[in-house]
């Protein structure tokens, strides 16, 4: 992990097209602004984890449907 120190108003640049700017510090909270292309997904960690969990649930539901479908077809063939 790269660790950097920035002050309010200072910016980090990631590759050529993403900037992260420190907008403010208040107690133990830091406000940041992120400029990134539309095709780059930017999420808070808890939101990202929820999205991944939802995707996993959707995959499991699809797998369950396929398994039930093929089990029913196998039962009909007997």
UniProtKB/Swiss-Prot annotation:
Q: What taxonomic lineage is listed for the species of origin?
A: Bacteria, Pseudomonadati, Pseudomonadota, Gammaproteobacteria, Enterobacterales
Under InterPro entries, the record lists: CsrA, CsrA_sf
Q: What is this protein called?
A: Translational regulator CsrA
Keyword Phosphoprotein carried by entry: no
- Kindly state a single biological-process term from the GO annotations of this entry: negative regulation of translational initiation
> Per its UniProt record, what NCBIfam families does this chain match?
csrA (TIGR00202), PRK01712.1 (NF002469)
> According to its UniProt record, where is this protein located?
Cytoplasm
According to the UniProt entry, its GO molecular function terms are: mRNA 5'-UTR binding
Q: What is its main location?
A: cytoplasm
